[in-house]
């Protein structure tokens, strides 16, 4: 019985994954056709952005401080004090800021998307939208995809700044590193391409989170229990997709070597 349930869950997961790919194509087609509900889009942008800002920035600040604590002592021991800021900057810009911000948004916003749309599905509210000649993709999905795609890069940029500020505070207060040395290292290591890649990653992650959350919500069945299962699997799938896509994006964007100024 357990094996049968596991096979059913895996089959349902793959079906939802295929549905998510088809939904992605539909969403972009609707956007190109200008079928955008502006009011809903603004509401979702407020949810993804301002309402999620505090937890994202707190996470980034402590990550920057912890990272600095972990590397500063070792770098000072080997006489590499002038590289601490640059290493933190590259780590945050290329990986930590976009990935951790996406993880926070997947947990907070992606789960909300799946739960809200899933509840509408099992209570037949989506059928009511069809009866009112309203396409659920236009009304529910497109605004959420646009909101995540626009707001996640902004949140990531703010998280990057806060994470760097946290690292600067720790390096100067605990390890007596001159802030000028720290900031010069950041400037020498970080290139404009790194910032662009950071924001582009966030855009991709935002679309992934919204598509998976909405797709899992639209395919929810089984009442309240089904909503709970959809919400849980939507978050887990979003995290898995974020990590996998991050690998390929990093491989494509940063596979070159020797592209960082060490002077």
Swiss-Prot record:
GO terms for biological process: phospholipid transport. It comes from the Bacteria. The lineage of its organism: Bacteria, Bacillati, Cyanobacteriota, Cyanophyceae, Synechococcales. The keyword Ligase does not apply. Belongs to the MlaE permease family. It comes from Synechocystis sp. (strain ATCC 27184 / PCC 6803 / Kazusa). Could be part of an ABC transporter complex. This is Probable ABC transporter permease protein slr1045. It is a multi-pass membrane protein. One of its GO terms (molecular function) is phospholipid transporter activity.
